[in-house]
Amino acid sequence: MNINFRYFTPDDRAEFFRMVKKFYAPPAVLHFPSDEVMLSSFDAALDMPELVKGIMIESDGNPAGYAIVSMKFETEVGGMAAWIEELYVDDDYRSKGIGSKFFAFLADELQGKIKRIRLEVGDENGGAKKLYERLGFEFLDYKQMVIDKDF
């Protein structure tokens, strides 16, 4: 199995939309966004690649998943951090090492540019949690708060 990672192109929109709908299927998320909101991350990755990185994951040339990574400054580490907004791998490609290869790709791409990789994982996602812990991720004790509205 040949795994390839590449940045989004406009031609990826339909395939991204197919996969992002699966990513946001309950019970994996707390809130199910509209189609427009789901596609906004794809558009942001094309429009603002310095802040939002859209990455297609391919296996032997076939779409196998995608990732959305946001770049932000974090005072705690005194530098830039990559926030894994979404990391999705289709069912047929899970447990084949793609997650580990993705993080190796990301580390190579962002070497010397970031000081932290940050992500969220739900309690129900035991497989992902094991992967992240094996890669050295640790839980933070923070409880996050948000306010959603158009400012």
Regions found by a protein language model. Give the residues of each.
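Conserved GNAT acetyl-CoA-binding A-motif
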Residues: 110-120
